[in-house]
């Protein structure tokens, strides 16, 4: 079977960049990923996958990748006539792009495919566009369906569904799930805050993170309430950024210099699942995605050295640690409280700072997770390095279908 490798990865810094365009960010990560792969040019690239969610709010509803890459083509930096496939899947967008590049290589379509994710969610001149971007992640054709669904679920969670101004529907749905988890399993606000504080502490060592200051659990709990039990520090911020990865075949890699081959990381598995309107006591779609990924890679959860997961809120990290098999159902809070998910623990999670602290430019997030894991597996993560890391997992979800994400990706990387 053909093997696929990530030969280069790169992420921009995440933050609020009112003076930078989508084209600016695309240029940075494209040139950055070439440099990381040790390539003088992109002439071998045979396919491109471009992920973005929000350019439609600026009027760019289609051909987004072509628009952002054309200046590079004109300058001779990006090869001509390369197919550019535009993808969107909410917060899972960049993971979908990587999945496409991976399939390109496995199918023999090309020996080198690029995945790029770019997003700008900070729009001080028209903040309503940011809310429109997020609203697009939930069914806009049948609002009554999910309004009644959440109203009924809120009763079961002990937290009435009462969306309010100044926040997205996502925060309310995560808060309801957290409230139900607390009522059912005894999870505490402090356990959620411990996971959050861990990530803020980690991001202080990540030069590309949006927030680079440590917080204690007490700081997190004292922050402004968003939707109980969530405080502002527990919720991913608004911001901009981009990330990219180059996926190659084993045959192409074998032709590269030894220094390039030495830094390549194999994609052991890449799985996707779609969400549904589930009950609160049903497992989420990431559990199935993880089970499929472990089977494809011939691994179990015990083989994972570290993970990056989609913590749009800090409760999500506790929940995903359960769905991914790092602990039993209902035990995510206790796992975080034990220190197991911190640097030096048995299963470090979100050492990049996670979405809540590294940042969450929607269409770039999945590839930024991959960039963090590449740094870790190459031994290049500095103060947040996991000693001896060989196998890593990225879980990313996007959009909402009830209490499921609409799309979920689980990717396993291995250093051979």
Question: Which residue ranges define each predicted feature?
Answer:
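Catalytic-loop motifs flanking and including active-site residues across diverse enzymes
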Residues: 26, 64, 93-97, 170, ...
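Conserved catalytic cysteine-centered active-site region
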Residues: 2-5, 52-116, 120-126, 132-161, ...
């Amino acid at each position: 079977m053909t093997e696929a490798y990530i030969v280069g990865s790169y992420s921009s810094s995440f933050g609020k960049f009112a003076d930078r365009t989508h084209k600016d960010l695309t240029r940075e990560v494209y040139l950055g990923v070439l440099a990381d792969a040790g390539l003088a040019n992109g002439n071998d690239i045979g396919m491109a996958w471009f992920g973005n969610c929000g350019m439609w709010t600026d009027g760019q509803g289609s051909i987004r990748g072509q628009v952002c890459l054309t200046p590079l083509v004109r300058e001779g930096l990006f090869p001509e006539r390369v197919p550019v496939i535009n993808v969107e899947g909410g917060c899972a967008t960049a993971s979908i792009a990587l999945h496409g590049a991976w399939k390109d290589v496995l199918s023999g379509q090309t020996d080198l495919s690029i995945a790029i994710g770019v997003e700008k969610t900070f729009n001080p001149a028209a903040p309503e566009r940011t809310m429109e971007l997020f609203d697009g992640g939930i069914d806009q054709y049948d609002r009554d369906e999910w309004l009644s669904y959440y109203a009924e679920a809120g009763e079961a969670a002990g937290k009435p569904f009462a969306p309010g101004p100044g926040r997205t529907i996502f925060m309310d749905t995560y808060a309801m799930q957290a409230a139900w988890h607390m009522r059912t399993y005894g999870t505490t606000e402090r356990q959620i805050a411990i996971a959050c504080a861990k990530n803020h502490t980690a991001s202080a060592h990540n030069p590309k993170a949006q927030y680079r200051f440590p917080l204690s659990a007490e700081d997190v709990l004292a922050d402004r309430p968003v939707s109980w039990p969530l405080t502002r520090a527990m919720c991913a911020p608004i911001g901009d950024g981009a990330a990219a990865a180059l996926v190659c075949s084993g045959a192409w890699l074998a032709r590269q210099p030894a220094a390039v081959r030495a830094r390549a990381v194999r994609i052991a598995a890449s799985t996707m699942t779609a969400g549904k309107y589930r009950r609160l006591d049903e497992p989420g779609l990431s559990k199935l995605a993880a089970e499929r990924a472990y089977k494809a890679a011939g691994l179990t959860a015990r083989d994972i050295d570290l993970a990056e997961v989609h913590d749009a809120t800090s409760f999500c990290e506790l929940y995903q640690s359960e769905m991914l098999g790092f602990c039993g159902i209902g035990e995510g809070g206790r796992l975080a409280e034990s220190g197991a998910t911190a640097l030096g623990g048995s299963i470090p999670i979100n050492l990049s700072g996670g979405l809540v602290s590294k940042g969450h430019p929607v269409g770039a997030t999945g590839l930024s997770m991959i960039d963090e894991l590449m740094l870790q597996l190459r031994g290049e993560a500095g103060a947040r390095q996991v000693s001896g890391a060989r196998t890593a997992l990225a879980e990313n979800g996007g959009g909402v279908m009830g209490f499921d994400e609409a799309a979920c990706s689980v990717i396993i990387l291995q250093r051979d």
